[in-house]
Amino acid sequence: MGLTSQLIPALVCLLVCTSHFVHGHKCDITLEEIIKMLNILTSQKNSCMELPVADVFAAPKNATEKETFCRAGIELRRIYRNHMCLNKFLGGLDRNLSSLASKTCSVNEAKTSTSTLRDLLERLKTIMKEKYSKC
């Protein structure tokens, strides 16, 4: 019995340390996948890259990063659902981005300036690389 009481604190410590490692590692893997997809997408010579999208980065200054990622996901979904191009990559990017985004947000296209899909992806790539460097 004495050995069991000595093992409990060690096991708890091991469990806590492991959970911190896994959490940080998950962040790295998700960001790595997003950056990899963005690199592939931005190197594409595809007419879809010039499609107009809402400038999700022109949001109010008090918008959170999660809200911005949510709006980016909405625009990506709009492109790959309405246009038959880059579906595999845009769908994968949308799935990975949703893990970093808030669950609900809105894109008011009437008041939002427009950009191209290429510009959206390039800005997103810059943000993700900065985020990865801090992770």
Curated annotation (Swiss-Prot):
Per the UniProt entry, the disulfide pairs are 27-135, 48-85, 70-105
**SMART domains recorded:** IL4_13
Which superkingdom does the taxonomy of this entry point to? Eukaryota
Give any single GO term for biological process.
Answer: positive regulation of isotype switching to IgE isotypes
Gene3D superfamilies according to UniProt: 1.20.1250.10
- Give this protein's Gene Ontology molecular function annotations: cytokine activity; growth factor activity; interleukin-4 receptor binding
GO cellular component, alphabetical, reads:
extracellular space
Question: Could you say which residues form the signal peptide?
Answer: 1-24
Q: Report the glycosylation sites.
A: 62, 96
Query: Which PROSITE patterns did the record assign?
Result: INTERLEUKIN_4_13 (PS00838)
Q: Does the keyword Glycoprotein apply?
A: yes
Q: Does the keyword Transcription apply?
A: no
Which keywords fit this entry according to its UniProt record? Answer: B-cell activation, Cytokine, Disulfide bond, Glycoprotein, Growth factor, Secreted, Signal
Kindly list the places in or outside the cell where this protein is found, as annotated in its UniProt entry: Secreted
**Known role:** Participates in at least several B-cell activation processes as well as of other cell types. It is a costimulator of DNA-synthesis. It induces the expression of class II MHC molecules on resting B-cells. It enhances both secretion and cell surface expression of IgE and IgG1. It also regulates the expression of the low affinity Fc receptor for IgE (CD23) on both lymphocytes and monocytes. Positively regulates IL31RA expression in macrophages. Stimulates autophagy in dendritic cells by interfering with mTORC1 signaling and through the induction of RUFY4.
Q: Which family does it belong to?
A: Belongs to the IL-4/IL-13 family.
**What protein does this entry describe?**
Interleukin-4
